[in-house]
Amino acid sequence: RVRVAKLMRKAGLRSIVKKKFKVTTDSAHKFSVPENILDRDFKPGTLGAVWVSDITYIRTQQGWLYLTTVIDLGDRKVIGWALSETMNAVDTVISAFNMAQRARPITQKLIFHSDRGVQYACHEFSSMLEKNPLIIRSMSRKGNCWDNAVAESFFKTLKAECVYQHKFSHREQAALIVFEYIETWYNRKRQ
């Protein structure tokens, strides 16, 4: 170990250490929860058939930033995303979903899958989805991150390849680097 550490230091390399897991999903709420229609079928075959979404956190020296993404399982691209200083539904899931709709208008039956977080279950978001008869809501089973594995996997990749490589002094710096990662690297080259 010591020899490897010395060689890495000499080469200007550093290892990526996985950070301790922090729970960000508040599923202890009174809102209704749709059944898990997706049921881990992560290969829909066509664009616009299944979107998955989740929220993660990014630490900065100014405080937390919360990143919400919407991924189309047809090509695994991040088609909608939002960064927010708060965890409210308007600034997170609604903003990311609206971006996804602008990028890929809903023209066929769509399964929208997420975890059971309060942002996804709240009246503001659920009533917005219910206005479109083409959207079928689906939520992971309680405490089961594997039901939303594609979204979780994207966050693991983002953090290993991007977030953990930086120490963000302010939120704007983190926002710029996350934007560059998603829009110029992940969606265009990484996949």
Describe the role of every protein-language-model region.
Residues 1-191:
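Charged DNA-binding/catalytic regions of mobile-element recombinases
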